[in-house]
Amino acid sequence: MKINSPLEAYKYLPQTNCGECGEATCMAFASKLIDRSGKPTQCPPLVKEKKFAKKLAELERLLAPEIREITIGVGDRAVKIGGDDVLYRHKLTFFNKTKMFYDVTDTMDEAALLERTKKVADFRKFYVGRNLLLDGVAIRSVSNDPEKFAAAVKKVSEVGIPMILCSFNPAVLKAGLEVAKDKNPLIYAANKDNWKEVGELALEYNVPVVVSAFNDLDGLKTLAKTFAEAGIKDIVLDPGTYPSGQGLKDSFTNFLKIRRAGIMGDTEIAYPIMALPITAWMAGISDPVSAAYWETAMAAIFTIRYGDIMILHSLEPYATLPEVHLAETIYTDPRTPVAVDSKMYKVGEPDENSPVLFTTNFALTYYTVESDLSSNGITCWLLAVDTDGIGVEAAAAGGQLTADKVKDAFEKSGFDLKKDVTHNTVIIPGLAARLQGDLEDKLGARVLVGPMDSGRLPGWFEKNWPPK
């Protein structure tokens, strides 16, 4: 993105405040463009009126991310990689979190192939209000047989998740593309020996392609430039991922050099980067648990330092869970705390005799409390108070959680402690105990101080509920 101020974007808008984009003013729409929650094409006058054609083209150029954004796959499960504008998250945010693809081979029998593919497709981990997923499958041609590879690709494509077709043999890649040409797979990879044939395949089938040059940045840049000049736009860079020692250090340094150059304006290398933690299994580690451990460590290294897409092997929970959790954490937008809606929630099927509690609307706090309650079979009413997405202790200390805020939250939720429950009692977090007296005055209700940690709620309820 070449501009970072709404005022700069505003110059390219119609400046009529017509409201057709859904915003009250053109300046409000300009703000959406800068924070990337809106697109120039969402302004109807820019698109429809010929006099704005040049402004639209220039605005799209200025707003385009420094690192090219690429889509892999089709439909609801399609994934985007790249699209970043900064080297450090605190300067804006990182976009399009690292995508995790897990390998299968064309020598696996059909049952094992489908079982592993479906394991990737069906993976779900609920975390802070959302499901974390694995992103796709990388089909490796071990046989080097076009027919076998095509058969494997066909079976995997039926599951409906994004694919990477992996072979250095253009004939094998072509066979795979023939059966998956409408699935927009990523093809891996073009190198100094096969670049011409693989480039032709990328153009013929209009699919994204990986260019690969292990520990040779000049060669990698030359390949990327050659492909771009040939009209191939969707390019992914593979600078090589060595699993240990000096090679791993060099790989890490190469990732830094590539991303820094791309962000600083070198358009010839401003593409997403592929990491290959799967090489941990080629490092001579005989114990599969140790190999998976090292693969996960490598995945962590390159998630933190600009790996946009990865190919991995282990599907054990001790490997996949750290991988997806770290990616989710690194790519959380620091500009906006993760928050739930401020309202009254039901835990189980509460009635007029059920206890009433509140916590803040910081998502991690809310879901921790909700989980501790539901997992212990505690049926209750749980109010999320709007604290701008800040946790209980910090919000109570900083003034975002006050008796007035809690009273307002009850009123906005439409919940009346005197009418909707028989006990006229509310339980507050132990970390907000200072609010007890003020809340009793504001709410006209009995206020009980709960434990400091929601994990202690079951024991607290045994001793203190129902109130005497």
UniProtKB/Swiss-Prot annotation:
- Residue ranges of domain 4Fe-4S in the record: 1-60
Cite the binding residues for [4Fe-4S] cluster.
18, 21, 26, 43
Entry's cofactor comment: Binds 1 [4Fe-4S] cluster.
Give one GO molecular function term.
Answer: 4 iron, 4 sulfur cluster binding
Q: Which UniProt keywords apply?
A: 4Fe-4S, Cobalt, Iron, Iron-sulfur, Metal-binding, Methanogenesis, Methyltransferase, Transferase
- Name the reaction it catalyses: 5,6,7,8-tetrahydrosarcinapterin + methyl-Co(III)-[corrinoid Fe-S protein] = 5-methyltetrahydrosarcinapterin + Co(I)-[corrinoid Fe-S protein] + H(+)
Q: Which InterPro entries match?
A: 4Fe-4S_dom, Ac-CoA_synth_d_su_TIM-brl, ACDS_complex_subunit, AcylCoA_decarb/synth_gsu, AcylCoA_decarb/synth_gsu_arc, Dihydropteroate_synth-like_sf
Q: Which NCBIfam families match?
A: PRK04165.1
What is this protein's function? Answer: Part of a complex that catalyzes the reversible cleavage of acetyl-CoA, allowing growth on acetate as sole source of carbon and energy.
What binding partners and quaternary form does the record give? Heterodimer of delta and gamma chains. The ACDS complex is made up of alpha, epsilon, beta, gamma and delta chains with a probable stoichiometry of (alpha(2)epsilon(2))(4)-beta(8)-(gamma(1)delta(1))(8).
The name of this protein is Acetyl-CoA decarbonylase/synthase complex subunit gamma 2
Q: Which organism is it from?
A: Methanosarcina thermophila
